[in-house]
Amino acid sequence: MVDIDKDNLPNIIDGNVPKNYELCKEGDIVFADASEDTNEVAKAVEYYNLNGKKVVCGLHTIHGRDNKNKTVVGYKGYAFSSMSFHHQIRRIAQGTKIYSINSKNFSKCYVGIPSKDEQQKIADLLRLIDERIATQNKIIEDLKKLKCAI
């Protein structure tokens, strides 16, 4: 998940949106369309907290949007990062040195979509776990620095 308030991304100057690119909206998801590693093909990132900032998908990405409003913001990033989704992607990724997918391949994949209430609970729980992991990693890094200083 990319929180535009916390994560530093390159900026688009007003009026300079690249041609053939659509601006991302809150909850849009971006997939990597190629990688040297099958674990990284279709790696997903969901955008949230855009707060009016202009964001476009970069090269070698597939831009996804929930046009039918079946998901809550925050759920898709976790759903498309699941092992069950990536097992499906590994079967359909093409290539020998560089593995790739295209938007047509996604029609062969399935992701479970529970009720919106359940999605929100799942997303909130996983976000709290991510925050806890980040906090623990920071503590570990600080302790390593302290150990080296002693």
Regions found by a protein language model. Name each.
Residues 54-62, 71, 83-86, 90-117:
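A short glycine-rich beta-alpha junction/loop motif
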Residues 38-46:
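Short, Lys/Arg- and Gly-enriched loop/turn segments at beta-strand edges
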Residues 36, 68, 115:
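Flexible, active-site-proximal loop/turn residues at the rims of small-molecule/cofactor binding pockets
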Residues 1-30:
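Sequence-specific dsDNA recognition surfaces
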Residues 76, 107-149:
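Amphipathic alpha-helical segments
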Residues 15-18, 95, 127:
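Short, solvent-exposed loop/turn positions at domain surfaces
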